[in-house]
Each structure stands twice: as structure tokens, then as C-alpha cells.
Amino acid sequence: MVLTRLLRVARFMSKVLYTRHDNEVVKITLNNPSRNNAFDDEIISSLITILEDIEHSDNIKLVMLNSNGKHFSAGADLNWMKRMSNCSHEENLKDASMLTTMLQKLNNLKYPTLAVIKGAAFGGGVGLISCCDIALASENSIFSLSEVKVGLIPATISPYVINAVGARNARRLFTSGERFDSNIAKQINLVHEIAKEEDLEKRISYFINHFKQNGPQAVIAAKKIVLDIFNKEIDNSVISHTCEVISALRTSKEGREGVTAFLEKRNPNW
């Protein structure tokens, strides 16, 4: 797409890098290492634009979110927060709405997402991780929801963090502001895997290879059904929806090819 090519140029050497590898894997890289990848309104706006472009792009198997520098993200830039504290309530509502838009677009992105964490992930950085489908962290990573330390709370990221770690863990982490390591992050389901930093690339390749083998439309449908029915009562409407989804996939070109390829003991053509 033209917009994709323009974004690659426009965002190169900016605070967010946007690249496509092997024509199937997209990489979004936080690139503000001098500020420990803390994000402000400029980064949030860039992420919204990038996520919108990805949503409307074709033939993507995996979207990876990572960072340059020592740390994944220090969360919201406090200079930005200080500037916003001098703005009106209406201006702060508009600003917060932009952040919630970005988080929602990341969480609801139709393609699978992989967060790769090195170093510190604080505040909003934890929110970004919580919005991704898979989280892979280096063993030396540290995490914190430290907003209460500066008289704030993790409000906009709260739905996604609570969804990831559960209400009881969130109550502790939101109110204490304590730091915790990658082992605790895995125990509470904030991250799925821990690896030595030198082994991260091997694990990334593992996930890329797996997603490349899967039916692309099936992957999109699999993610969507989780978002569609999570926390809903298992009533007739949910049951009917699941029947409709599997019926459509069984009779789709991709579904027929996948089953046929399996029975013929060959790789599917997709």
C-alpha cells in the first residue's frame, strides 16, 4: 500500500519505527531511548496511524511490538503529564481519549500481536503489553504500575491490565506501585514466556514460524471469537454465533484447502 510505504519513510528515525519483514511480519518499534521509550501525544498519534494502516493491510501473519534501547517503555512521559496538568479538564479528556483509542486499536487489531520486552516496562508500558496477544520477556525485565507514586492511577490501561492479570492482582499492583520481576509477571499472566536476552531472537523466530504455518483467515477468526465471546453468558446467542463461525470456515476456500492438505499429507497453499 502507498500509505504503508510513506509511513516507513516518515517514521524512520522518529519516535516509532514501522517496518515489514518477509512481507508477512510487521514490526512496530518504540524508538525514544533517550527518554526510556516513554510515550507522549506524538508517539500515541503515530501508533494510532500505524495500527490503522496495519488493520487495513493484507497478508500479515504477525505484528511484533518491541523497543530500541535498554528499556521497553517507562510509560507516559512525565513532561507530557506536567504539561497536561496545566490544561483544562476538556483538553485532558480529549488527550486521554487519544490514548484510549490507541490502546483499543492495539487490543482489537485483527492480526495476532507479539510484545517483546527488555528492561523496564512501567505504567503505560504494562498497558501496551496487556493489549498484545502474546508477551515474551527477557529474564532481567522489571515491571511496575507506578502511577500512584506521582499521585495518578493507571486508569486508561486498567481494562486491559485487569483482563491480563485478574482483578485481585490488579488491586495489589495498582495500589502498591511496587516493582516486580519477570518471574512474577509470568505467574500473574502478564507475560507468557521468559527467555535469556540472547535467546529472545530464537523465541521470536519460533512464533513467526508457527504463525506462518496457520491459515491466515482462521487466525483472524480465532482471535475475533475470543474478543467476541469473552465474559459473555453462554446463552443461545453465543452458541448460535459459534455455530455460524465454524460453518462459515468449514465451507471457506481456506478451510477446504486446509482439511484437504492435511488428508493428502502436504502443506496447504496459503
Which residues does each PLM region occupy?
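Glycine- (often His-adjacent) and acidic-residue-rich active-site loop
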Residues: 48, 59, 67-102, 121, ...
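Charged catalytic carboxylate motif
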Residues: 42-46, 98, 105, 203, ...
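Helix-loop "lid/cap" segments that line or gate small-molecule binding pockets
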Residues: 173-174, 225, 229-230, 244-250
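Conserved CoA-thioester-binding segment of acyl-CoA-metabolizing enzymes
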Residues: 1-68, 104
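Terminal peptide-recognition signature
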Residues: 28, 32, 47, 65, ...
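Amphipathic alpha-helical segments at domain termini/boundaries
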Residues: 12-31, 179-211, 220-230, 258, ...
